[in-house]
Amino acid sequence: MTEKVFDTTLGTIHYWVQAGERVQPWLIFLPGLTADHRLFDKQMEGLGGPYNCLVWDAPAHGASRPFRLEFSLEDMARYLDGIFQAEG
């Protein structure tokens, strides 16, 4: 897995990808409220061959701290879209 960052005006979001060299479908893992990216370590490891995989530490969770608590669910969707755009 490769750790990457996505900068916002409220803080930095950390996310991890496991992507192959060829074009293949993406699997996106979104940990729940009390978890971080480590929740999906085994899935990322096992599915990282036939799929591109991405997992994040949501804003204000795990490595994505500190993060100002001034964001909405709509903002989180925009952040994810920005990450998807960055990853192609």
Task: Describe every region a protein language model picked out.
Residues 1-12:
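N-terminal cap/lid segment of alpha/beta-hydrolase-fold proteins
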Residues 5-7, 32, 68, 72:
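Pocket-edge positions in alpha/beta enzyme catalytic cores
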Residues 54-88:
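Active-site loop/oxyanion-hole signature of alpha/beta-hydrolase fold enzymes
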